[in-house]
Every structure is written in structure tokens, then in C-alpha cells.
Amino acid sequence: MILVLAESAIELVPREIWSHPAVASDARRRGKRPGEILLDRARHHPAMAGLEDGARRGRPDIVHQVLLVFQYSLLNRRGLGRVYIHTRGDYIIQVKPQTRIPKNYNNFVSLMEQLYALGRAPPHGDSLMELHRGSLAGLLEQLGGRWVVLHERGARRRFAELGAALLNSVVVVGGFPHGDFSNRWVLEKAEAVYSVGDEPLDAAQAVCRAVAAAEASAGLI
Amino acid sequence: MILVLAESAIELVPREIWSHPAVASDARRRGKRPGEILLDRARHHPAMAGLEDGARRGRPDIVHQVLLVFQYSLLNRRGLGRVYIHTRGDYIIQVKPQTRIPKNYNNFVSLMEQLYALGRAPPHGDSLMELHRGSLAGLLEQLGGRWVVLHERGARRRFAELGAALLNSVVVVGGFPHGDFSNRWVLEKAEAVYSVGDEPLDAAQAVCRAVAAAEASAGLI
């Protein structure tokens, strides 16, 4: 299963709010410049009111949760999975399967800030994570041009069927807190759109069930 | 499904290390006294070297991850689940199903510190979470005296069978980062001990699959 977390709400603090007190004090506290820290709704909420599309931005916790669910899964540990993070503003984060994502959120944030600063992590030796410019369309093309989407309005499948369908697919999940894909074509050109249950699930919940279904299908659980 | 996260690695900083620089500076930075903040391996590692059983302490992120997986699940949202946190040092944290756990880890830590300070959260109105003294044995007795355990050395069951077995059970999962239950009787007196896959899983991974299996069994996914 290749998981693509799309339009993920992770980015460095945009220039237009560098001088906002909520941002400046957070950066100073952490000994960094405002442009070097991740935008975080939990810390920078007062500064985000005027940001375009602000409700869908500043949620690195979504990426953290999904990476924890995926990287520590049996699917990934058995070499049957790979995850790519496509971000708002068109960056692609590649994560090698053996990458142990920090379980502590603050350590994860520091790792992501290093990644944005250097384009790779760790700074030396074999890179485990890499960041480069890239569009969602380009990534999906690179991954073979065929994908399925997990979406609240998708078709319901029995759990076992869903697992079989996802195990060998490129699976796109939205990495944003609210609303829908800005890239409408992701849904329109998908080979299939599946829902997981009858209610909207956040990204980590959807990925948890997709991975469990694929693992059950592969006989891992 | 009633989930009991047992011997969870969450506690306030113990008195013996209040004066350690790593603790004192963290408390000062957060405007709190050392005895009011959660012990956190990611922040207080230098202070924990001499702590008894230190390798199994100071991991509130484990409780956070499990609560996120459980509280935002379809199982819980449909009223088919309930979670209790039993902590190291014998506290019991009760969490009402409608409790929306903060997705941001730092906000979660603040909520837990309020809970330890006041015994409840939020401070006024209907409480959503409550903390009180209590043993694991007392809790399991209160919940009917019959339980199953998820454990790496448990019996493997097909995913569908596991779901059916867990859906209407009290399910105990270890809330500690390493090692095994200190309460050996938890395993010895359990009605059944199940494993999820052939490799050890961290608590959140085990709970993610247990919940997905129970949901599939209940026809929710």
C-alpha cells in the first residue's frame, strides 16, 4: 500500500505573520527565527485570523498522527507499505520505511523544521526523510498514475474487501482538518473512492482502519 | 468494548527530582511548580536517570495516542465503547465518551495537569474527565471481574474472530513503553490473552487494531 497524505496542513510560518506577537514570542522562546518554525494552530491561533484559507492550515499534528499510525504498523515494518506527504504549497516529503518517527510531538516538530531547513533528515549520513518541491499531480503520476481515495462520500465496502482493494493500491487521504480537496481532480480521476464507515473520520482514524484492513488482507493480523 | 489502559506511564514529576535543573527550568518556562507538571521523558530525560523503574515512566504521549485512537473512533462515537486509564501509582482516570481529547499534545499535557490538580476537567459544569485513587484490581472488579488482555505472547485469532471477542469485553492493554505488566495476575487471571499480529505493537497500534476489529464485527466499517 502506498499512502499519499494530500494537501497536508504543514508549512513554515508564512512571511506575512512573522512579526505577529504570537509568532515572534514562540520563535524567540524556541531560539529560532519566525520563518524557521512550523505554523501551528495551537500556538499561533491569534496570528492566523487573517490568513487565506486559515481554517485548513497550521496542523502539523495531523501529519504526526498519520506518520505514527503508518510507520509503526506491521504493514510498514514488513515492507508492504510506503508513505508520501504532499503538503499545502506543493512540497513532497518522502519517508523511508525504516524511519522511526519521534513519538513526542515537540520532537517531531523540531525534526520537521530541520527537514524544511536542510531538505533532509538527519543532516548527515543516509537520509531517512527528504523534502523537495513537487505537486500532487506529479507525485501521483510518478507513482503510476492510478490511485484510490478514502473520502467520507466514497462507496462503502465490507472491511475484508476494502483491505484487499487497498493492499496493492496508491491510497490518497486528505491531510487537512476541514473541508475537501482543493485539487478536485483527485476525486474525479480516481479509480475508486471508498468511505470507511458512515461518518467522517479524521486522517489518522481513516489511515488506522485502512492499514488494519490491508494487514488483515495480507494475513498479518 | 471497555478499554482499560493499565499501568500507564503518566504521573506528576516525583518530589525527588523537583530540584533537578531539567525539571526546574521546564516548570519555570511553563509558569508552574515542579510538582504540578507531568513527568515527560522528552523533557526530563537527564533528571530521570536515578528514578526507580525509570525506563517505564514519563510517557504521557502513550496515553494521549491511545485516547486519540479511542475517543475519535466510530465505536466510541456510536456509544459502543468506554475507556479507563489506570496509571502507575494507582490513579484511575475516567473519560466520558463525549470527551474531545485535544489533538495537540501540549494542550493535552495542560489538560492532564489540570486533572491532577483539581481531580476533574473541566473545572466547572459537567465533568468530562475525573481522576481518583484506585487500583487496577479494584477497577477490574468494578467492571465485572472478567477481562481479556492484548499481549504480544497471546493467542493469535483471525481478525474477524478477534473483533467478535473484543466487542463485548473488558480489554486490558499495557500503557507502558517497555517490559511487561508488574501486576502479573492481570495475565494469569484473564479469561483470554490475545496477540494482534506476530510482532510487539505499541499501545496505540494495538488499540487501533482492536477498535477496528470490534467496529468491523459490529458492522460499523
Swiss-Prot record, chains A, B:
Q: InterPro entries attached here?
A: Alpha/beta_knot_MTases, Rbsml_bgen_MeTrfase_EMG1/NEP1, Ribosome_NEP1_arc, tRNA_m1G_MTases_N
Q: CDD domains from the xrefs?
A: Nep1-like (cd18088)
Q: Give me any GO biological process, just one.
A: rRNA base methylation
Site (described: Stabilizes Arg-59) = 61
Per UniProt, which keywords does this protein have? Answer: Methyltransferase, Ribosome biogenesis, RNA-binding, rRNA processing, rRNA-binding, S-adenosyl-L-methionine, Transferase
Q: Report the EC code(s) recorded for this entry.
A: 2.1.1.-
Q: Which SUPFAM superfamilies match?
A: alpha/beta knot
The answer, when asked if Transport is one of the entry's keywords, is no
The answer on whether this UniProt entry bears the keyword Transferase reads yes
According to its UniProt record, which reaction does this protein catalyse? Answer: a pseudouridine in rRNA + S-adenosyl-L-methionine = an N(1)-methylpseudouridine in rRNA + S-adenosyl-L-homocysteine + H(+)
A GO molecular function term, named singly, is: rRNA (pseudouridine) methyltransferase activity
Disulphide-bridged cysteine pairs: none
Task: List residues binding S-adenosyl-L-methionine.
Answer: 174, 179, 196-201
Q: Which HAMAP family match?
A: NEP1
Q: How does it assemble?
A: Homodimer.
UniProt function note? Methyltransferase involved in ribosomal biogenesis. Specifically catalyzes the N1-methylation of the pseudouridine corresponding to position 914 in M.jannaschii 16S rRNA.
Q: What is this protein called?
A: Ribosomal RNA small subunit methyltransferase Nep1
What is the organism of origin for this protein?
A: Pyrobaculum neutrophilum (strain DSM 2338 / JCM 9278 / NBRC 100436 / V24Sta)
Q: Which gene encodes it?
A: nep1
